[in-house]
UniProtKB/Swiss-Prot annotation:
Gene3D superfamilies linked: Aldolase class I (3.20.20.70)
Subcellular localization, as worded in the UniProt entry: Cytoplasm
Function: Transaldolase is important for the balance of metabolites in the pentose-phosphate pathway.
InterPro entries: Aldolase_TIM, TAL/FSA, Transaldolase_3B, Transaldolase_3B/F6P_aldolase, Transaldolase_AS, TSA/FSA_arc/bac
Active site annotation, chain numbering: K83 (schiff-base intermediate with substrate)
GO cellular-component term (any): cytoplasm
Official protein name in the record: Probable transaldolase
Pfam families named in the record: TAL_FSA (PF00923)
Gene of this entry: tal
GO molecular function, one term: transaldolase activity
Assigned EC number: 2.2.1.2
Keyword match Protein transport: no
Similarity comment: Belongs to the transaldolase family. Type 3B subfamily.
Length: 217
């Protein structure tokens, strides 16, 4: 399973990229607004850091305007993926953009049927939201598994991006459920790298070395 980072914070993206684990980035209007910067400016800087799919979301909810925004955003860089919300207008926009060779990521997916419609409209990616489904008592990972099974049975090439990831366990569950990608906040990526026994082991190695050879420089 590939790892994307879910943020518009360039410094977080830079730090995660230095780990050598990133395959792409997802952003949304809320994340861009949090940074207080121009969308195009942020997206262009992200593209200079990560050589992989970069999802940038349209703002409009009318399909003609979605198409216009999508076309403009796609001109920024070859790696741009147009992120479009799951709705009737969004599906129409995805259908048009995909026929023009523009990659799309249909977001705010909360059911396998929504994912099927998005895939058949031509979406490159679908993004089911684990955490938000969990919040309403509907295990998000079950939806991811349904989508993965359905896509496999019907040989659908659309890739699944597990989104609204809040914990390392979400990442593990997504990987085991068959998600192609998980888009993960920076803090969760760092949490994934840690384990109490690793810290204890490192401390013991250092103490043993210092005992045998003196303090390391």
């Amino acid at each position: 399973m590939k790892i994307f980072i879910d943020t518009a914070n360039v410094e977080e993206i830079r730090k995660a990229s230095e780990l050598g684990v990133l395959s792409g980035v997802t952003t949304n209007p809320s994340l861009i607004a949090k940074e207080g910067r121009d969308l195009k400016e942020v997206v262009e800087e992200i593209c200079s850091i990560v050589d992989g799919p970069i999802s940038a979301e349209v703002i409009s909810l009318e399909y003609e305007k979605m198409i216009e925004e999508g076309r403009e955003l796609s001109k920024l860089h070859k790696n741009i993926v147009i992120k479009i919300p799951m709705c009737e207008e969004g599906l129409k926009a995805v259908s048009v953009l995909s026929k023009e060779g523009i990659k799309t990521n249909v977001t705010l997916i909360f059911s396998s049927m929504q994912a099927l419609l998005a895939a058949r409209a031509g979406a490159t990616y679908v993004s089911p939201f684990l955490g938000r489904l969990d919040d309403i008592g509907n295990p998000g990972i079950e939806v991811v598994k349904q989508i993965a099974d359905m896509f496999k049975i019907h040989e659908i090439k659309t890739e699944i991006i597990a989104a609204s990831v809040r914990t390392p366990m979400h990442v593990l569950e997504a990987a085991m459920a068959g998600s192609h990608i998980a888009t993960i906040p920076y803090k969760v990526i760092i949490q994934m790298s840690k384990h109490a026994l690793t810290d204890i082991g490192i401390e013991k190695f250092m103490k043993d070395y210092e005992k045998a050879f003196g303090e390391s420089k």
